[in-house]
Swiss-Prot record:
Function: Catalyzes the conversion of uracil and 5-phospho-alpha-D-ribose 1-diphosphate (PRPP) to UMP and diphosphate.
Broad EC category: transferase
Protein name: Uracil phosphoribosyltransferase
Cofactor dependency: Mg(2+)
UniProt organism field: Pseudoalteromonas atlantica (strain T6c / ATCC BAA-1087)
Positions with a binding annotation for uracil: 194, 199-201
EC numbers on record: 2.4.2.9
Cofactor binding: number and manner: Binds 1 Mg(2+) ion per subunit. The magnesium is bound as Mg-PRPP.
InterPro entries in the cross-refs: PRibTrfase_dom, PRTase-like, Upp_B, UPRTase/APRTase, Ura_phspho_trans
């Protein structure tokens, strides 16, 4: 597993704007999409390509590179992950979208899937999980478990911010999954919020609590 903190100036500038108190839902949502787009560019850097022959503009055969295989399925985790979906799809508009929703069981405190709409051939694709925040890691681990149960072998995660505790939890359970984030923040507080973090990303994206 590799954890890649994307320190590109545009990523860091936009993330800084998102951290400001009083940011509007509109601005937060737009920035989440933009940072998601930039993270996607970095995360797809290592995708395998193959050389194919096509007819060029003058109807002459030429060789070009294309992404190999069935390519990608984007997996936004409800609800906040939807805020990054548009930005990701701007770069890979033909990707299939698999949606996963989870809630936390009050007795076991474990994530339980309440919605699962995963593309049928997920075992042939790279799954790109998108969620604004990686906090405790429980939701991500449950999503990875679900995808692997369906046969998916190549999984990556995109996050605006991540907590060291969550990264450690995911590494211990799924060392083969790569994580891309705009920032590895300091820690979780006693309520499970990332510090300095972004607050509640879902509330800010959708304007509702």
């Amino acid at each position: 597993m590799s954890v890649k903190e994307i320190n590109h100036p545009l990523v860091q500038h936009k993330l800084g704007l998102m951290r400001e108190a009083g940011i509007s839902s509109k601005n937060f949502r737009e920035l989440a999409s933009e940072v998601g787009n930039l993270l996607t560019y970095e995360a797809t850097r290592e995708l395998e390509t193959e050389t194919v022959e096509i007819n060029g503009w003058n109807d002459q055969p030429i060789k070009v590179k294309k992404i190999k295989g069935k390519k990608i399925t984007i997996v936004p985790i409800l609800r906040a992950g939807l805020g990054m979906l548009d930005g990701v799809m701007q770069l890979i508009p033909n990707a299939k979208v698999s949606v996963v929703g989870l809630y936390r069981d009050e007795e076991t405190l474990q994530p339980v899937a309440y919605f699962d709409k995963v593309v049928k051939d997920v075992e042939e694709r790279t799954a790109l999980i998108v969620d604004p925040m990686l906090a405790t890691g429980g939701t991500l681990i449950a999503t990875i478990d679900l995808l692997k149960e369906k046969g998916c072998q190549h999984i990556m995660g995109l996050f605006l911010v991540a907590a060291p505790e969550g990264i450690e939890a995911v590494v211990s359970k799924h060392p083969d999954v790569d994580i891309y984030t705009a920032a590895v923040d300091d820690k979780l507080n006693e309520h499970g919020y990332i510090l300095p973090g972004l607050g509640d990303a879902g509330d800010k994206i959708f304007g509702t609590r």
